[in-house]
């Protein structure tokens, strides 16, 4: 899992930046997953890659790297809890306070 952060000052001057980064990430993931599935030649030197992709689709419902708060809530809450317990952050904020709203984004 990766998390992209935008400095508040940059976001406040350029509020479009969050949705642009999200859209670029969604498109990048779509292209990468399509390339993995292309059977003309393998994207990686794993002869069982197609079987692995099918199993991943079965187990994760088609997307092992879902975007948005809701599909990642347990992981995000654990991250905030651990950071607070280990004194990296002064208080454990609600997850919604950590992300800007992205209208139309999946899982938000």
Set out the residue ranges of the language-model regions:
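Glycine/small-residue-rich pyrophosphate-binding loop that anchors the diphosphate of NDP-sugar donors
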Residues: 2
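Secondary-structure end/capping motifs
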Residues: 5, 10-85
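Long, low-complexity C-terminal extensions of enzymes
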Residues: 68-108
């Amino acid at each position: 899992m990766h998390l992209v952060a935008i400095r508040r000052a940059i976001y406040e001057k350029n509020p479009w930046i969050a949705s642009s980064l999200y859209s670029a990430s969604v498109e990048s993931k779509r292209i990468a997953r399509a390339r993995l599935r292309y059977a003309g030649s393998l994207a990686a030197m794993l002869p069982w890659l197609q079987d692995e992709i099918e199993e991943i689709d079965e187990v994760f419902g088609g997307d092992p790297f879902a975007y948005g708060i809701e599909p990642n809530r347990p992981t995000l809450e654990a991250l905030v809890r651990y950071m607070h317990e280990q004194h990296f952050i002064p208080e454990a904020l609600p997850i919604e306070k950590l992300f800007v709203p992205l209208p139309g984004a999946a899982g938000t």
